[in-house]
């Protein structure tokens, strides 16, 4: 991104470039770096000194072979898309002839063209992690007496922390654990320094001399210093003299020094920069010189010299991308390989055999390490394939969580909050909602990962000597030294720039300075935001929280059966669609020979190239991935031209929703509190119809009585449920199946105790008597569909640990219905509450009925006025047959620029169509509409227009649930909650209040007691409901189980709860006769 020849022009970088660059950096640098450090511990010569054995891997001679299977086949057959890694190795044993050979050390998963890895047929992506950069940081805090304590925190490459602190008595301590601390002189002595060196190099020797005179802080010899350090670190006080000194040194090296003092290359650079040291970058461990320099700087802080560090500044963070994570796993695999080689050599020596290179190296460590990493590591996610937007966004995700990072419960508000150094690098809007807010987010559109894991953002350099504009990428550390002009400078008149006063950023502050003082200016208005936020038109008119919701909900939009481009967009839709990999793009210029449903044939320089199409492929979110040709026979194509559109793309642009006619007005309470009223037209014309592909799977095990059998002969099963099975017992391709139908017929052998007669028959005829039970695969309750694919997956020979699998894929066609969730691009979301006939919907003055009716009260309180601008501009675009692409913050050109644009387009639409109601000067943007039921006009004008509305993946077919029978909680004996556990509907406080308000005391009693946690009564109710009659009344001693639980909890607090029964005679109450009953 440096030195673009096109002056003043900037192109948006590839949105998945970060993943590609990270994986290439791992192949070019990470692999060689880890191989060059093999073995990491003692060499094999030290392991086997008597045998003179050595084993080496040569780092610069590795190579990857071409994968045996294609990416498409790996996904279909549930395999891993990987390549074999070959490395040159050498083996030496005494005076034997040295062996040198290229060996395979395992399979390395490869990144595909989308930036993901395919592991066992599942696409996975490795997200970025933000950690505190290794180095030293100075801060201060108040002790329990209110005095200021200055602290220097040294963070290692592994995340370990060593704190140096100076208290009010000018005593300097090193905190080796949360509870224990030792004198800085003792730590320096344990690291190899003597008192003379310390005093000669100290800036304040008098403080160290005074410190040495104090008994608890005095200098000690190295042996006793190591002993005290070990005692404090391990909290060990007994048998000090009996411990071996060499053992203590080795233990401290492996635990304390390796965890807290290994800085790494980045940590060494940071400490040298902060403390003005000149230590070689190859020395990556903490040295006594570092401790002394850090102490000198800490004392200076005590005397008011120097500045404290901002731990949340982005210059003090580093990004662990896919390159770093894969390199760590490769190093772990090499450690396991080293252990395996040692074991193999040891066994060979015991048997007096000469091992060979072919038997020494095994591929198991590398293969299993990466498989467990992609399956179990918290930063390895299942790739979100809901729509093309998620294909791009997921790889640009970052997280503070994960190994070495923060936790959800302990992260403070200051860490979660927006920092000025984030601008242009981390999106200030797009983050998760809930407990992870601020801990997970997305990179800005132009952000890139630079050297040492820093985030960089591009800027235009403003040169005073020449008019040439050069583009440079600056990290947050370098940016502090320059005046950065904001996006407003883009709109300035080139002739009068010298006279302008513009806003700028300098050292995390916003200033107003003259144009000639600006060093750099922004490249693009969307530079500060993530991709999801960059797709929101009129973003500047929305509240930030609503923009956050919009960004999250766009990733939840399901691809529709017939996609449509938005009328009002931002111009970012094309880049997102192209980089997502969903459309099919030609790599060569040529001529179309023919187009088929499954492939496109292209003639290139006399050769025929076949481009296969993706047809009805299931995504990880059960949405469909499908490509349709956009070219015809005889067309000439250029390189980079789109041959086929995918799901949710039209003409190479992102198309997540539909342009529908909406109005903002209340309608009989059906759009109260974010409910949405829709027209039947959306159902009948399949406007919001989507396809979903569900997967059903069954495993075929090898049991003790033999293998399970797949058959269509299932005893004691209704033949109607078996109607779709073929002769092999598997459902027929193309069958229409309903809930409860058998998809795969399977019989499992059972181990049962036979009667004496059957055992006699077995002995006489020497044939076992088979007893089986049916364990068929049935279609779950989530509905009906069409079987589009059946896969029988074999992975090697079948065994108990490696069963065969049969997968059945079912296509569902879902129309929009009551309970589905819809949303706009401004955080305006709602649930469909009623589907009105077309003739009952409110209609415009030209007779067109509205498609959706939103509640107008949801706009002013939520401050997402951008939807009103989009609605009105969409109406003008629909009438004029125009599409608008509007960049945000257009007020930098003139005041009220958005309003003027919308009104001018409405006025032009009114003139060209001859409809004066489109733009009424008295109430611009509003119109008088009519009630479809009566034909009468409504009293007030209503805002109407065309908005781009999405259908979200939260659909009623996946949510609706009813409980007839199900499990109970063991503690409270109440029904469990949740659809997945067949739970019940929770009746909480507000529901109880509602029933109390209606006065339904008996129904309330039944819900809370008889049908809930009355153990005996709820069993009797079932028979009563079947046979009729009055509900049984519980006995006085039969109390609800939740009440018993409350009593037991009170007893645990030493509170005894009793109640008394008041006896009653025939005539009146006798309050003096009471029977005490313990609960």
UniProtKB/Swiss-Prot annotation:
Reactions accelerated catalytically: RNA(n) + a ribonucleoside 5'-triphosphate = RNA(n+1) + diphosphate
GO biological process: DNA-templated transcription
InterPro entries tied to this protein: DNA-dir_RNA_pol_bsu_ext_1_sf, DNA-dir_RNA_pol_su2, DNA-dir_RNAP_su2_dom, DNA-dir_RNAP_su2_hyb_sf, RNA_pol_bsu_bac, RNA_pol_bsu_CS, RNA_pol_bsu_protrusion, RNA_pol_Rpb2_2
Uppermost EC category: transferase
Pfam families: RNA_pol_Rpb2_1, RNA_pol_Rpb2_2, RNA_pol_Rpb2_3, RNA_pol_Rpb2_6, RNA_pol_Rpb2_7
Key words of the record: Chloroplast, DNA-directed RNA polymerase, Nucleotidyltransferase, Plastid, Transcription, Transferase
One CC-aspect GO term: mitochondrion
Amino acid composition bias (Polar residues), ranges on this chain: 966-975
Region (Disordered): 963-982
EC numbers: 2.7.7.6
Keyword Transferase: yes
GO MF terms, alphabetically ordered: DNA binding; DNA-directed RNA polymerase activity; ribonucleoside binding
Superkingdom classification of source: Eukaryota
Region forming the signal peptide: none
Subcellular location: Plastid, Chloroplast
Plastid recorded as keyword: yes
Gene3D superfamilies: 2.40.50.100, 2.40.50.150, 3.90.1100.10, DNA-directed RNA polymerase, beta subunit, external 1 domain, DNA-directed RNA polymerase, subunit 2, domain 6, RNA polymerase alpha subunit dimerisation domain, RNA polymerase Rpb2, domain 2
Quaternary organization: In plastids the minimal PEP RNA polymerase catalytic core is composed of four subunits: alpha, beta, beta', and beta''. When a (nuclear-encoded) sigma factor is associated with the core the holoenzyme is formed, which can initiate transcription.
Family named by the database record: Belongs to the RNA polymerase beta chain family.
Function: DNA-dependent RNA polymerase catalyzes the transcription of DNA into RNA using the four ribonucleoside triphosphates as substrates.
Protein name according to UniProt: DNA-directed RNA polymerase subunit beta
